[in-house]
C-alpha cells in the first residue's frame, strides 16, 4: 500500500528579474551568472505577496487538476523556510483561505529537501489509514532572505510554490520508496544569520558555495544509489529525473555520474532559479503541463538543503 499524486499545480509571481537587471545593483554580469549557475531569470514576489499567497495559488491549481472538492482535503502540510509569520503556520493560514473547518494543518521545515521529507511523511500518514486526501505544498519567498549586495547568493534564488494532492493508491502507481537524512554538524555550510530566538530577525542567507557543491554531489548521489539498490531499480528504469533546481552544475554533474540521458533530466533552474522546497513540485508541475509524462513512468526526485538535510524518492506515475 502506498500513496499517489492525483493532482499538481505550480505558481510563480508575475515579476521577473533578469540577470541583466541584477547588474544594476550588484557587481555581476549575465555571463558570470549563467556560467556558474545556469540561471538567467528569477520570479520575485511583491512586497505584499507572501508565502501563503503563493501557496494558495498553487494549491488551487492542484485541487482543480485532481478534480476534487476542497472539502475532500483532510490534512495540509506546507514545506517552507519562509513563513509569513513566526506563527501561525503558513498551512494554517492556507486552511483559512480555503475555508476549511477543523482539519489539521502544519508547516514542515527541511529547507530545500522539504518536499522529499513531506512526501515520506505524507505516505506514512495515508498508509496508516488516518488520512485519505492530503494537500502537500512547497512554497517559498526566498528573496526575503537575500542580501542584495552579496552576488554569491542573491543571484541564486527565486520565489514560487508547487502543490500536490495525494491519496491512497489502489494500483501499482504511487510512491515506491523514499529516504531522508540530515547532518547537523554541517549546518554552517548554509544558514541564515538570524532567527526568532537568536536575534529576533530572519537574517540573510550565508553560504559556503564550494563546500555545498561537494556535499550536494556526494550526498545526493549516495541517496539515489541506495534508493535504487534497495528497490532493485537501475538507472535505465528511470523515465524522468527531477532533482532540486539549485544549480545547473550540480544537476549536470549528478546526471553525468548516474549516466542518466539528457532528455530524461528535468531542468527549470534557468527560469525559476532556486525556489528551495518549491523547486521539485514546480518542476513536476512544469513536466506534467508539457504533456510528456504518462501513466507508468518512473520518476526520481532528489534534493539537498541546509541543515544539512537531503533525500530522494521514487514514484511510479
UniProtKB/Swiss-Prot annotation:
Protein name (Swiss-Prot/TrEMBL): Beta-ketoacyl-[acyl-carrier-protein] synthase III
Gene Ontology, cellular component aspect: cytoplasm
Alphabetic keyword roster: Acyltransferase, Cytoplasm, Fatty acid biosynthesis, Fatty acid metabolism, Lipid biosynthesis, Lipid metabolism, Multifunctional enzyme, Transferase
HAMAP family, per the entry: FabH
Source organism of the structure: Rickettsia typhi (strain ATCC VR-144 / Wilmington)
Complex formation: Homodimer.
Similarity remark: Belongs to the thiolase-like superfamily. FabH family.
Any one Gene Ontology molecular-function term assigned to this protein's record: beta-ketoacyl-acyl-carrier-protein synthase III activity
NCBIfam families assigned to the protein according to its UniProt record, in alphabetical order: fabH (TIGR00747), PRK09352.1 (NF006829)
A GO biological process held by the record: fatty acid biosynthetic process
Amino acid at each position: 500500500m502506498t500513496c499517489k499524486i492525483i493532482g499538481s499545480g505550480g505558481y510563480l509571481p508575475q515579476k521577473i528579474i533578469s540577470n541583466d537587471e541584477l547588474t544594476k545593483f550588484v557587481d555581476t554580469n549575465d555571463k558570470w551568472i549563467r556560467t556558474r549557475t545556469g540561471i538567467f531569470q528569477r520570479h520575485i514576489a511583491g512586497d505584499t505577496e507572501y508565502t501563503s499567497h503563493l501557496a494558495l495559488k498553487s494549491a488551487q491549481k492542484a485541487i482543480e487538476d485532481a478534480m476534487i472538492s476542497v472539502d475532500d482535503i483532510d490534512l495540509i502540510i506546507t514545506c517552507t523556510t519562509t513563513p509569513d509569520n513566526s506563527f501561525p503556520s503558513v498551512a494554517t493560514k492556507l486552511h483559512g483561505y480555503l475555508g476549511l473547518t477543523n482539519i489539521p494543518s502544519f508547516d514542515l521545515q527541511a529547507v530545500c529537501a522539504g518536499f522529499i521529507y513531506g512526501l515520506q511523511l505524507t505516505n506514512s500518514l495515508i498508509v496508516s489509514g488516518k488520512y485519505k486526501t492530503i494537500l502537500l505544498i512547497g512554497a517559498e519567498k526566498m528573496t526575503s532572505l537575500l542580501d542584495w549586495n552579496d552576488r554569491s547568493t542573491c543571484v541564486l534564488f527565486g520565489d514560487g510554490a508547487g502543490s500536490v494532492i495525494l491519496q491512497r493508491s489502489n494500483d501499482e502507481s504511487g510512491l515506491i520508496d523514499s529516504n531522508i537524512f540530515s547532518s547537523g554538524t554541517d549546518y554552517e555550510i548554509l544558514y541564515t544569520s538570524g532567527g526568532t530566538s537568536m536575534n529576533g530577525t530572519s537574517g540573510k542567507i550565508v553560504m559556503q558555495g564550494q563546500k555545498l557543491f561537494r556535499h550536494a554531489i556526494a550526498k545526493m548521489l549516495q541517496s539515489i544509489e541506495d534508493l535504487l539498490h534497495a528497490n532493485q531499480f537501475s538507472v535505465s528504469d528511470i523515465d524522468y529525473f527531477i532533482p532540486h533546481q539549485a544549480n545547473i552544475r550540480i544537476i549536470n554533474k549528478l546526471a553525468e555520474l548516474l549516466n542518466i540521458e539528457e532528455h530524461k533530466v528535468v531542468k527549470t533552474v534557468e527560469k525559476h532559479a532556486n525556489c528551495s522546497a518549491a523547486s521539485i513540485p514546480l518542476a513536476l508541475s512544469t513536466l506534467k503541463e508539457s504533456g510528456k509524462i504518462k501513466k507508468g513512468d518512473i520518476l526520481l526526485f532528489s534534493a539537498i538543503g541546509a541543515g544539512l538535510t537531503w533525500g530522494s524518492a521514487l514514484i511510479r506515475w
